[in-house]
Amino acid sequence: MKKISILGSTGSIGTQTLDIVTDHPDKFQVVGLATGNNIQLLSEQIRQFRPQIVAINNESQLEDLKSLISDLDYTPIILAGKEGVIEVARYGDSESVVTGIVGCAGLLPTIAAITAGKDIALANKETLIAGGPVVLPLVEKHRVKLLPADSEHSAIFQCLQGVPTGGLKKIILTASGGAFRDLPVEKLPQVTVADALKHPNWSMGRKITIDSATLMNKGLEVIEAHYLFGVDYNAIDIVIHPQSIIHSLIELQDTSVLAQLGWPDMRLPLLYALSWPERIYTDWEPLNLVKAGSLTFKEPDHQKYPCMGLAYAAGRAGGAMPAVLNAANEQAVALFLEEKISFLDIPRVIEKVCDRFAIHNTSTPSLDDILAADNWARQEVSNCLIANPV
């Protein structure tokens, strides 16, 4: 029985992780839950899974949460604020922490979990994108496992099992192409928030769905793959695969190509991250190749997806530049979701912020440097819009 804590328990990653726990009560026990604002769903999760410790990031909702569970026959530890989330991350009884918090907000709790000796099921890619130079040495120092829990990096990780050192030649990340994969470039200026949120294959949160539409999600995954697998950016490719059946591939030195296939279902990579190196039986629908039909591929259009090139450039620049890219993207996507900028403004804003940061970048940033760069980039997005409206 593995004891786990879940950061972001009411979001897409968190609820699907809890589905896994429900399906496998003999394998996993929830000891900690943390979320941002959704106290109604959190209270229901507390009733069902009876964690030992919970946290709500929004401190103003603490008393309301306590009231919602006041009739329980047990009393979990209930905390609030960023420090409360960090306490859940490093809570003593948990063996593994699922990091499902969206964005750079997941960085400090993940670091707290690592320094407390917890294995990490990494569903928060921003942890490595922004904090890779700091996080990876901590993983090595504290001898914990950092296991990818998103579909693409889990696919790569699975394909690499048994590949000898030096055998890997190239990583190939597959992308659905997002909501606008079949839309002509000239029609992008007219797209709305509602249009961008219509992902053709995956059910995900709002922010990551927009990232999929811009292909920034895949660009961020390139940076994450670089850190996770130690592969040069020149050896990481992106290919559009509309069916989302092949979750990613690796090419070996002898030109053999290995791939991991399955229906688009986030539960599979989450389960593997929690159960590795075991393979746990499930009654989920297996992939039927005949039902899936044809699998198609095409090169991504760099004119249509400029965010992809911005991510490669930030990754190659290194230092704190990926943190700046990530923060600028988070802010730009939030503004788009609020209908304050257009869809095409997202890459324009990001490029401006990254260009302005270039002279400030350092090759070996500390955690404080990374956090400062993150804060700077968020403010700079506002400055860009005030000084030079996009």
From Swiss-Prot:
Report whether ATP-binding shows up as a keyword of the record: no
Q: In which pathway does it act?
A: Isoprenoid biosynthesis; isopentenyl diphosphate biosynthesis via DXP pathway; isopentenyl diphosphate from 1-deoxy-D-xylulose 5-phosphate: step 1/6
> What are the alphabetically sorted keywords of the record?
Isoprene biosynthesis, Manganese, Metal-binding, NADP, Oxidoreductase
In this chain, Mn(2+) is annotated as bound at D150, E152, E221
- Which cofactor does this sequence's record say it needs? Mg(2+); Mn(2+)
Name any Gene Ontology BP term.
Answer: isopentenyl diphosphate biosynthetic process, methylerythritol 4-phosphate pathway involved in terpenoid biosynthetic process
Give the Enzyme Commission number: 1.1.1.267
Q: Could you list the residue ranges that cross the membrane?
A: none
| Its biological purpose | Catalyzes the NADPH-dependent rearrangement and reduction of 1-deoxy-D-xylulose-5-phosphate (DXP) to 2-C-methyl-D-erythritol 4-phosphate (MEP).
Similarity comment: family membership:
Belongs to the DXR family.
Q: Which NCBIfam families match?
A: Dxr, PRK12464.1
- Protein known as: 1-deoxy-D-xylulose 5-phosphate reductoisomerase
- According to its UniProt entry, this protein's organism is Microcystis aeruginosa (strain NIES-843 / IAM M-2473)
Q: Which gene is the coding source of this polypeptide chain?
A: dxr
